[in-house]
């Protein structure tokens, strides 16, 4: 029986991530990402990469965002569109449980899109030009206990397809590394 795990796009392709600058956070996430992937590969787990909604909508040269910037009809519709084939794949694997075991889906906590338990919010909008309170706006960014928009839509689609009880959704998050490591067996 083949074991399968679905992962956020940047778990396999960090080039898709927005440019980061906090080296300590980068290193902690990278170490866990490598540990997670090594464990998955050494256990013979098949890895399916989810699409990145930010990259497929905004490309590589995008600014960092917070989840409340993505909490709109247009971004949610984009997420659903790119998730439709993923839901179809999940259903097909689950319908053939004699051959496949779906271990779950792994997001990336802290992401405005792919956070499972944690996402970032802030009062960010508007132009940078002439803005006198830019630092005040940037300082509103904080980590909160809530899903990112892509994962929120994914969970809704799992529920709409009666898959919620059959598909575990967890995350890669350096401060809580067992969340992603424990899903692999």
Kindly give the residue locations of the regions a language model identified.
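Short amphipathic alpha-helices and their capping/turn segments at secondary-structure boundaries
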Residues: 1-2, 31-46, 86-103
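Residues lining hydrophobic/aromatic ligand-binding pockets adjacent to catalytic sites
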Residues: 2, 13-28, 138-141
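Short, glycine/charged-enriched secondary-structure capping and boundary segments
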Residues: 20-23, 119-123
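Divalent-metal-activated hydrolytic enzyme cores
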Residues: 43, 60-68, 72-98, 126-185
